[in-house]
């Protein structure tokens, strides 16, 4: 009787494992298919945060704009602020990732290693919570795949159009209009730097009313963007 019970339990376990693998395969297929769907420039993706705002009837402001209609200094500032190796890595910055692992093994506080590509796939396909560290593991292969399929220019275009720049404010056109009352094409170097340093915490930081700390960060990014050179060459 005990042997029969163990056999039933094993069959039940195998059945659940098979179901879990099927679910995992389906979940992996969704971002794969969407990545190819998002290749054409006339397709305007939305982020999971936008979908959440729609589901909760919060509403949001997002006005898709071609990267050709964004002041180049904005993309340059974002690269120099968020991901200096954007034009050189393949979706994941292995040097930064290695540093995070070394810090974690040493018991030290870890620094961020999320690339613009990783942030893009997170915003498109994943929820920030409650996945936590599991989400980070999923981000890595997704970012590598996304980078292999998309051009750097298209990745940046999607990123700039789905990034959050304040409560209910998504994309650079809505951000430029909301914070400075101008289209993204007319952003100055200073405004671009302020918007770039807002990205890590868009709810708490206000580029239109920066505090001393945000102004110092913007000064640094403005200088770096002015000397970005080859670091932004993939967008040309």
Swiss-Prot record:
Function noted in UniProt? Peptidoglycan polymerase that catalyzes glycan chain elongation from lipid-linked precursors.
The record's family statement is: Belongs to the glycosyltransferase 51 family.
Task: Say yes or no: keyword Magnesium present.
Answer: no
InterPro entries recorded for this chain? Glyco_trans_51, Lysozyme-like_dom_sf, PBP_transglycosylase, Pep_trsgly
Query: Which protein are we looking at?
Result: Biosynthetic peptidoglycan transglycosylase
Query: What class does this enzyme belong to in the EC scheme?
Result: transferase
Record pathway: Cell wall biogenesis; peptidoglycan biosynthesis
Q: How does it sit in the membrane?
A: Single-pass membrane protein
One Pfam family from the record:
Transgly
Q: Which GO terms describe its biological process?
A: cell wall organization; peptidoglycan biosynthetic process; regulation of cell shape
What superkingdom does the record give?
Bacteria
Could you tell me what reaction this enzyme catalyses? Answer: [GlcNAc-(1->4)-Mur2Ac(oyl-L-Ala-gamma-D-Glu-L-Lys-D-Ala-D-Ala)](n)-di-trans,octa-cis-undecaprenyl diphosphate + beta-D-GlcNAc-(1->4)-Mur2Ac(oyl-L-Ala-gamma-D-Glu-L-Lys-D-Ala-D-Ala)-di-trans,octa-cis-undecaprenyl diphosphate = [GlcNAc-(1->4)-Mur2Ac(oyl-L-Ala-gamma-D-Glu-L-Lys-D-Ala-D-Ala)](n+1)-di-trans,octa-cis-undecaprenyl diphosphate + di-trans,octa-cis-undecaprenyl diphosphate + H(+)
Q: Which UniProt keywords apply?
A: Cell inner membrane, Cell membrane, Cell shape, Cell wall biogenesis/degradation, Glycosyltransferase, Membrane, Peptidoglycan synthesis, Transferase, Transmembrane, Transmembrane helix
> What PANTHER family does the record tag this protein with?
BIOSYNTHETIC PEPTIDOGLYCAN TRANSGLYCOSYLASE, MONOFUNCTIONAL BIOSYNTHETIC PEPTIDOGLYCAN TRANSGLYCOSYLASE
Alphabetical GO CC annotations of the entry are: peptidoglycan-based cell wall; plasma membrane
EC id: 2.4.99.28
Chief localisation class: membrane
HAMAP family xrefs: PGT_MtgA
- Any idea which GO molecular function terms this record carries? pentosyltransferase activity; peptidoglycan glycosyltransferase activity
Say which species the protein is native to.
Mesorhizobium japonicum (strain LMG 29417 / CECT 9101 / MAFF 303099) (Mesorhizobium loti (strain MAFF 303099))
Membrane-spanning ranges: 20-40
Protein's cellular compartments: Cell inner membrane
Gene name in the database record: mtgA
């Amino acid at each position: 009787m005990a042997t029969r019970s163990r056999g039933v339990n094993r069959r039940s376990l195998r059945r659940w494992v098979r179901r879990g693998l099927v679910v995992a395969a389906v979940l992996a297929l969704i971002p794969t298919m969407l990545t190819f769907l998002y290749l054409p420039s006339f397709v305007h993706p939305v982020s999971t945060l936008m979908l959440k705002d729609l589901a909760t009837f919060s509403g949001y402001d997002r006005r898709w704009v071609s990267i050709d209609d964004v002041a180049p200094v904005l993309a340059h500032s974002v690269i120099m602020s968020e991901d200096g190796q954007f034009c050189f890595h393949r979706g994941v910055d292995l040097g930064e990732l290695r540093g995070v692992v070394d810090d974690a093994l040493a018991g030290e506080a870890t620094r961020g290693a999320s690339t613009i590509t990783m942030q893009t796939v997170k915003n498109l396909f994943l929820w920030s919570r409650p996945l936590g560290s599991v989400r980070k593991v999923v981000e890595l292969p997704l970012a590598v795949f996304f980078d292999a399929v998309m051009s750097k220019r298209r990745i940046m275009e999607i990123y700039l159009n789905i990034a959050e720049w304040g409560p209910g404010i998504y994309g650079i056109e809505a951000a430029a209009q909301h914070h400075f009352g101008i289209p993204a094409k007319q952003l100055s170097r200073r405004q671009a730097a302020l918007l770039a340093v807002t990205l890590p915490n868009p709810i708490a930081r206000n580029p239109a009313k920066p505090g001393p700390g945000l102004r110092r960060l913007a000064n640094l990014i403005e200088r770096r963007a002015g000397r970005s050179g080859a670091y932004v060459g993939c967008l040309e």
